[in-house]
From Swiss-Prot:
Subunit structure: Homotrimer.
Predominant localisation class: cytoplasm
Protein name (Swiss-Prot/TrEMBL): 2,3,4,5-tetrahydropyridine-2,6-dicarboxylate N-succinyltransferase
The protein's annotated pathway: Amino-acid biosynthesis; L-lysine biosynthesis via DAP pathway; LL-2,6-diaminopimelate from (S)-tetrahydrodipicolinate (succinylase route): step 1/3
Reaction catalyzed: (S)-2,3,4,5-tetrahydrodipicolinate + succinyl-CoA + H2O = (S)-2-succinylamino-6-oxoheptanedioate + CoA
EC number, UniProt record: 2.3.1.117
Subcellular location: Cytoplasm
InterPro entries membership: DapD_Trfase_Hexpep_rpt_fam, Hexapep, Hexapep_transf_CS, THP_succinylTrfase_dom1, THP_succinylTrfase_N_sf, Trimer_LpxA-like_sf
Species of the source: Neisseria gonorrhoeae (strain ATCC 700825 / FA 1090)
GO CC terms: cytoplasm
Length: 273
């Protein structure tokens, strides 16, 4: 049986799986899937085009099963001790492994095993959860969190305190996705499998989930669950039908132009290894 078939079958019986009852074949399939996610060979979601993604549900199921097959244990990062089922990505890394990986991880940066970080990315004191994929040249700034199975594109900037939602709890059907060359402003939250399409700029303090109305003030269109490519988005509100109150929304104020790009450009000086 293929990895996928083993995982799919085991997931149907997940309630009966424990660290002591898991079949050796299932355990190895789960661990191999996590290894492939960790190396970037496998992704929870694969891009087909702008705004178009294929979700590998079985890989997400393997992430969930990994919590069923392992006991908590004491983990040590050299400074602190933890009690968890998932070791950190860098727990056993040598200097050569860091050099070969080609990204920077500053003190305070935490990535869990099963996450992937590509070359020239920068991890400030931040958190990257299991199953996440951080692509080349991305900046994960201070106190930003990349949730389980989230997909972060090339040259994305996640500003300080940004939250990118995961899929494990509450259980989501699709991962949250930030496509290539996007800028997410400080303290913004993108969650519930929402997609920010290529080249978009999200201002600070914008909150987007599946039910958030995203209003294009130029066309009057309302989007939900996705930000169209090249959008500049700020927080706003829309009036109720009777005019008695307003509710939060995100507003597309314009399309990205040269002025916007100049303000949000990637600094290559920070990424050279």
């Amino acid at each position: 049986m293929s990895l996928q078939n083993i995982i799919e079958t085991a997931f149907e019986n997940r309630a009966d799986i424990t660290p002591t009852t898991v079949a050796p074949e299932v355990k190895e399939a789960v661990l191999e899937t996590i290894r492939q996610l960790d190396s970037g060979k496998l992704r929870v979601a694969e891009r087909l085009g702008v705004g178009e993604w294929k979700v590998n549900e079985w890989a997400k199921k393997a992430v969930l099963l990994s919590f069923r097959i392992q006991d908590n244990e004491v983990l040590n990062d050299g400074v602190n001790k933890y009690f968890d089922k998932v070791p950190t990505k860098f727990a056993d890394w040598s200097e050569d492994e860091f050099k070969n990986a080609g990204f920077r991880a500053v003190p305070g940066a935490v990535a869990r095993r099963g996450s992937f970080v590509a070359k020239n990315a920068v991890l400030m004191p931040s958190y990257v959860n299991i199953g996440a994929y951080v692509d080349e040249g991305a900046m994960v700034d201070t106190w930003a969190t990349v949730g389980s199975c989230a997909q972060i594109g090339k040259n994305v900037h996640l500003s300080g305190g940004v939250g990118i939602g995961g899929v494990l709890e509450p259980l989501q059907a699709a991962p949250t996705i930030i496509e290539d060359n996007c800028f997410i402003g400080a303290r913004s939250e993108i969650v519930e499998g929402a997609i920010v399409e290529e080249g978009s700029v999200i201002s600070m303090g914008v909150f987007i989930g599946q039910s958030t109305k995203i209003f294009d003030r130029t066309t009057g269109e309302i989007y939900q669950g996705r930000v169209p490519a090249g959008s500049v988005v700020v927080s706003g509100s829309l009036p109720s039908k009777d005019g008695s109150h307003s509710l939060y929304c995100a507003v597309i104020v314009k399309r990205v132009d040269a002025q916007t790009r100049a303000k949000t450009s990637v600094n290559e000086l920070l990424r050279g290894i």
